[in-house]
UniProtKB/Swiss-Prot annotation:
This is Nucleoid-associated protein Lcho_1975. It comes from the Bacteria. It comes from Leptothrix cholodnii (strain ATCC 51168 / LMG 8142 / SP-6) (Leptothrix discophora (strain SP-6)). Keywords: Cytoplasm, DNA-binding. Belongs to the YbaB/EbfC family.
């Protein structure tokens, strides 16, 4: 009986690993948009943190360089937070609330 339970547990673990890998692959194609300056600066990135596009409203190009740099950084950080939220939501569904060690994040 224990052998059967262990085999079933191993099968479940393999299925979960396969599902997590599939979800990670899907997240590489999911895009999120971060914004700052009321949408004047936008960063589009995947949930794997690959930046796809950066959009800067032309009205900002004549303005203060430091302000523009701050807006780009803020938009990037907003995109990262959104990507992490989408990743956590998708992976959380797969782990069904399984607690993770402190500091461990998905995707691995």
């Amino acid at each position: 009986m224990i052998k059967g339970q262990l085999a079933g547990l191993m099968k479940q673990a393999q299925a979960m690993q396969d599902n997590l890998k599939k979800a990670q692959d899907e997240l590489a194609n999911v895009e999120v948009e971060g914004q700052s300056g009321a949408g004047l600066v936008k960063v589009v990135m995947t949930c794997k943190h690959d930046v796809k596009r950066l959009s800067i409203d032309p009205s900002l190009l004549a303005d203060d360089k430091d302000m523009l740099e701050d807006l780009v950084a803020a938009a990037f950080n907003d995109a990262v937070r959104r990507a992490e939220a989408v990743s956590q939501e998708k992976m959380g569904k797969l782990t069904a609330g399984m607690p993770l060690p402190p500091g461990m994040k998905f995707p691995f």
